[in-house]
UniProtKB/Swiss-Prot annotation:
Name used for this protein in its record: Decarboxylase MYCFIDRAFT_34057
Source organism per UniProt: Pseudocercospora fijiensis (strain CIRAD86) (Black leaf streak disease fungus)
A single MF term (Gene Ontology): lyase activity
Documented EC number(s): 4.1.1.-
InterPro entries: Dimeric_a/b-barrel (IPR011008), EthD_dom (IPR009799)
Role, per record: Decarboxylase; part of the gene cluster that mediates the biosynthesis of an emodin derivative that may be involved in black Sigatoka disease of banana. The pathway begins with the synthesis of atrochrysone thioester by the polyketide synthase PKS8-1. The atrochrysone carboxyl ACP thioesterase MYCFIDRAFT_190111 then breaks the thioester bond and releases the atrochrysone carboxylic acid from PKS8-1.
Database matches in Gene3D superfamilies: 3.30.70.100
Pathway(s) it belongs to: Secondary metabolite biosynthesis
Family label: Belongs to the tpcK family.
């Protein structure tokens, strides 16, 4: 697989019609923090501080998926010859936007820099957490077939 800076891979900066980027943060909780304290901080401290900023800069959707011990245990019911590896992350946070510029504006916002950057150190293991970004492709929404992320029902 070519590196992300490969000259054969075109740069993506402008919004694509009916296409949305999804930044996925594969998060680990801060060492010594319980699962419940981590989830509580993200839901009741971090999210309230972040969501208005996301709206301000045109973010389309932001979700968190907390992978606590009881839900991870459910995976034993799904394991088979192909699904055998349980992801070790404590949370997946997904941010959906039209252009990379939308998210870059958040990171440049003075309020973000003053309050949110420091808050991450209160609950997240920022040295172990990982990120990736890609296009969202949606096929089923609310039990209905769809064409594209915000496309028409088929």
């Amino acid at each position: 697989m070519p590196p992300a800076t490969d000259p054969e891979i075109p740069a993506v900066t402008a919004p694509q019609k009916n296409k949305y980027l999804c930044l996925t943060i594969l998060g680990y909780k801060k060492e010594g923090m319980t699962e419940e304290a981590y989830r509580n901080h993200m839901l009741n401290v971090s999210a309230p501080m972040t969501k208005d900023l996301m709206v301000k800069y045109g973010i389309r959707r932001w979700t968190m998926i907390h992978n606590q011990t009881p839900t991870r245990a459910l995976m034993t019911q799904l394991f088979d010859s192909q699904m055998v590896n349980l992801a070790p992350y404590d949370c997946f946070s997904q941010v959906v936007f039209e252009s990379i510029e939308d998210y870059k504006k958040i990171k440049l916002d003075p309020w973000y820099r003053k309050y949110l950057v420091g808050d991450h150190e209160n609950f997240a293991d920022t040295k172990r957490s990982e990120m990736t970004i890609g296009w969202i492709e949606e096929f089923v929404r609310d039990g209905q077939l769809v064409e594209g992320f915000e496309g028409e029902y088929v």
